[in-house]
């Protein structure tokens, strides 16, 4: 059993956190919440605690959550097989109904947990106030010779109106957002949560974008953690296949964000207890730092 930190150790931890609390006071931090951190009970409580604490010390956390594993489980229960192309879920009308139902349940659970830990969280989707406008996404399928593929009700972001989120921030609420957008005819679109988080970071002029994953960060082909990457290095890693699958939308979101003015993006291990606090409030941080150059 690991030894408990002494009072002096705790004082050192608080002293190390102080300059970061001062630096990020009043700043917006967009956090994409997903992976094991959403399914393991202790990790869920740690995340809710961390988010509430960041708000208490003066930061403005904005949460965007996924729900891939839970959606997959529900699709199996109703007899549907999930399919992915370039890390994006193929979404027909029936699948979209399941996506909205499951994301709604997840959203309320996150809101409730944060509130239990002293925060004031409010659950939203991009359809509320039509603040995330979307259109149909087409992707090239490399396995079909770069053929354009219709993914159904999978959307790409046309625009985000930050007014609703900014209003909630000024009233000291914590927005918790499910990644569903609305089309021009009122139709629902399933949008990759990493891309929604990146888009929100841009329009909110966020100080940081943090993406929680089920890996220590971005790994090279030997499985070693890459602690820092530039845009050029990311392009090279995608070209040689080191970055693939579900990591591609995360990296794309990170690159778009830092190229457009978000100061830093971090891809961190959501399986580490209090990893969010370690990233924001300590000297070393955790995971992979993405920079424009």
Curated annotation (Swiss-Prot):
Q: Name one Pfam family in it.
A: AA_kinase
InterPro entries per UniProt: AceGlu_kinase-like_sf, AcgluKinase_fam, ArgB, Asp/Glu/Uridylate_kinase, Glu/AcGlu_kinase, NAGK-C
* Keywords per UniProt: Amino-acid biosynthesis, Arginine biosynthesis, ATP-binding, Cytoplasm, Kinase, Nucleotide-binding, Transferase
Q: Which GO terms describe its molecular function?
A: acetylglutamate kinase activity; ATP binding
Classification via SUPFAM superfamilies: Carbamate kinase-like
- Give the subcellular location: Cytoplasm
**Origin superkingdom:** Bacteria
Q: Write out the GO cellular component annotations.
A: cytoplasm
Record function comment: Catalyzes the ATP-dependent phosphorylation of N-acetyl-L-glutamate.
Q: What is this protein called?
A: Acetylglutamate kinase
Question: Which organism was this protein described from?
Answer: Nitrosospira multiformis (strain ATCC 25196 / NCIMB 11849 / C 71)
Q: Which gene encodes it?
A: argB
């Amino acid at each position: 059993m690991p030894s408990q930190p002494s009072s002096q150790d705790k004082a050192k931890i608080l002293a190390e956190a102080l300059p970061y609390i001062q630096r990020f006071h009043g700043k917006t931090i967009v956090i994409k919440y997903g992976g094991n951190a959403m399914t393991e009970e202790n990790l869920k409580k740690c995340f809710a605690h961390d988010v509430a604490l960041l708000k208490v010390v003066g930061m403005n956390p904005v949460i965007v959550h996924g729900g891939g594993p839970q959606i997959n489980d529900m699709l199996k229960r109703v007899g549907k097989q999930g399919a992915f192309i370039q890390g994006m879920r193929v979404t027909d009308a029936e699948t979209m109904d399941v996506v909205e139902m499951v994301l709604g349940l997840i959203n309320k659970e996150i809101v409730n947990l944060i509130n239990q830990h002293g925060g004031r969280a409010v659950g939203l989707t991009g359809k509320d106030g039509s603040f995330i406008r979307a259109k149909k996404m087409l992707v090239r399928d490399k396995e079909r010779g770069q053929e354009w593929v219709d993914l159904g009700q999978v959307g790409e972001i046309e625009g985000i109106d930050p007014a609703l989120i900014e209003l909630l921030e000024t009233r000291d609420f914590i927005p918790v957002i499910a990644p569903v957008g609305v089309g021009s005819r009122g139709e629902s679109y399933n949008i990759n949560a990493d891309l929604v988080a990146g888009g929100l970071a841009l329009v909110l002029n966020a100080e940081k974008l943090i993406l929680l994953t089920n890996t220590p960060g971005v790994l090279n082909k030997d499985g070693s953690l890459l602690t820092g990457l530039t845009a050029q290095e990311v392009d090279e890693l995608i070209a040689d296949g080191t970055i693939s699958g579900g990591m591609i939308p995360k990296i794309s979101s990170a690159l778009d964000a830092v190229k457009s003015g978000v100061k830093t993006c971090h891809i961190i291990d959501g399986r580490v207890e209090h990893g969010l606090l370690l990233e924001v409030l300590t000297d070393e941080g955790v995971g992979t730092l993405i920079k424009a150059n």
